[in-house]
Amino acid sequence: MHEMIQEYAKRLKLSWIRENFHTVDIEDPKQYLLTLFEKEVNQREERRINLLLKTATLPNVSGKPFDWSEVQLGQGLSQESIIEGKFIEEKENMIFYGGVGAGKTYLSSLIAINAIQKYGRRVKFYTVASLANELLEANEKGTLNKLFKKIDKLDLLILDELGYIPLHKQGAELLFQVISMCYEKRSIIVTTNLQFGKWNHVFGDPILTEAVVDRLIHHSHLLLFGGESKRMRESMMLKN
């Protein structure tokens, strides 16, 4: 009987029950079944969360609490609402602006981890350069639509380090397609060390740059890192 239970559990893909059914006390048959199914569901959920974390390709996070002391929040934002990802529910974007080492990448990673672990959301982390390269490679291989479909399933796309490396013309155009595809359908976090007026250095085309900025800042929030001045916020306000 023991072997038959294991075999049936294996066929039904009830891995926790298969390995542990004999360790649960049998006092009440209904409670016994409830306990087995609860454990099975919990294990499946844990595996799902671990898979989401793996596929998100997030940078390593130390686990230290985030230091908000040098971060200026946009209107209507709170630390809790940012970490809880309220903007993801509303399909809004976040622009994190500040110098190197100001904590932009770290905060975006904390938001992503919470979104995955607490809400089971689909997240993907890219540097802008790595996504552009992946898009170019997929285009050459004829698998661009496959990559687009993967991005289309996301709840949150993180684009890190915008401004560090100028993009190839075709890479910039493909990245614009991704941003347009996400517009009002899923949230994007962009981390950057450049004011909007200098994004043309990355995209290399004033018209394309303006289109990118317009789609990103519509329904978006701005966070200033490292005690930056109000110039970035003012430039954003002029765009609205």
Which residues fall in each region the model found?
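Residue-level preference for the first positions of well-ordered beta-strands
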Residues: 93-95, 156, 189
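N-terminal pre-Walker A segment at the start of P-loop NTPase domains
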Residues: 62-85
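Interdomain "pre-motor" coupling segment immediately N-terminal to P-loop NTPase/helicase cores
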Residues: 6-60
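Active-site catalytic microenvironments for nucleophilic, acid-base chemistry
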Residues: 39, 114-118, 181
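Post-Walker A helix-loop "phosphate-sensing" segment adjacent to the P-loop in P-loop NTPases
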Residues: 112-126
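Walker A/P-loop nucleotide-binding motif
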Residues: 91-107
